[in-house]
Amino acid sequence: MLDLRGDPIELTAALIDIPSESRKEARIADEVEAALRAQASGFEIIRNGNAVLARTKLNRSSRVLLAGHLDTVPVAGNLPSRRENDQLHGCGAADMKSGDAVFLHLAATLAEPTHDLTLVFYDCEEIDSAANGLGRIQRELPDWLSADVAILGEPTAGCIEAGCQGTLRVVLSVTGTRAHSARSWLGDNAIHKLGAVLDRLAVYRARSVDIDGCTYREGLSAVRVAGGVAGNVIPDAASVTINYRFAPDRSVAAALQHVHDVFDGLDVQIEQTDAAAGALPGLSEPAAKALVEAAGGQVRAKYGWTDVSRFAALGIPAVNYGPGDPNLAHCRDERVPVGNITAAVDLLRRYLGG
């Protein structure tokens, strides 16, 4: 059985050594559930698919939700775990079994927390959003996600990262007239027309937005270009896929309108293919403010999209905070500094009390 009350570094290693690729989390969920039932007193514990949920009912004035996903990307020859000096190596070491270990250890060792606690260990975060276990819990058990602040244990190198950017993908398509390239004047080259789109992107200046002391830098980038029929054909169609990462003060609708404004006047068709709203940091809320104080005021904006957006949609302030370097997530040499693990335990113990 997992030892939740022992060394959280050893607990991290034990979690890493349980393979848990997305959709194959049954074993790790079984282990987590059994350990919580045996070692975390005062929690109501339930199972939802391959997700494990636990909560206290201490009638505290505020509730803190700790959320972590149990799944990892496919193993890349990086199991079992191994310790080298101050680094713990293995699949999921940073993303995010070290964060899970911190939450599990605290659940079993906090005697008198000053907040009520909810823990959500969920499945299928690393694959398509439609399969995400947190989304399923939101649909099937919405009362379990009620909280005054949520902490998602994604790797942040031990710094609190508030909110997250939104993301929007669109395809800009242009049309022309097909012709033999030997008689190019009879055609209208669609690929050439993309030049005007790329020119707009080349001179675009992304904005930076300060929200609750966090600076969110936006980005509007071409990520794919498609076109061409054959080596002797003037193409009659071409497209460029654009990804807009926008600050959380903009809605998806406002982000889409901004893209239309940027390319206004060009003869292009704009089709939205994917979008997810960002999450405001909400650091002015009392429960979130206390967390920032426990961290000594060290907080920064989160770049990229994470599940904190799901909490923001519910009106719950949410932050990312966990051990490990996010740049090492999904790498063959994924690892976490063991000092990050103990530091996260210490900080959250100060914040949660007990």
UniProtKB/Swiss-Prot annotation:
EC number: 3.5.1.18
SUPFAM superfamilies found in the cross-reference section: Bacterial exopeptidase dimerisation domain, Zn-dependent exopeptidases
Active site location: 71, 125
Cofactor-binding details, from the entry: Binds 2 Zn(2+) or Co(2+) ions per subunit.
Known pathway: Amino-acid biosynthesis; L-lysine biosynthesis via DAP pathway; LL-2,6-diaminopimelate from (S)-tetrahydrodipicolinate (succinylase route): step 3/3
CDD domains with a match to the protein in the record: M20_DapE_actinobac (cd05647)
Reaction(s) the record says it catalyses: N-succinyl-(2S,6S)-2,6-diaminopimelate + H2O = (2S,6S)-2,6-diaminopimelate + succinate
An example Gene Ontology biological process: diaminopimelate biosynthetic process
GO molecular function: acetylornithine deacetylase activity; metal ion binding; succinyl-diaminopimelate desuccinylase activity
Family indicated by similarity: Belongs to the peptidase M20A family.
Primary role: Catalyzes the hydrolysis of N-succinyl-L,L-diaminopimelic acid (SDAP), forming succinate and LL-2,6-diaminoheptanedioate (DAP), an intermediate involved in the bacterial biosynthesis of lysine and meso-diaminopimelic acid.
Protein name: Putative succinyl-diaminopimelate desuccinylase DapE
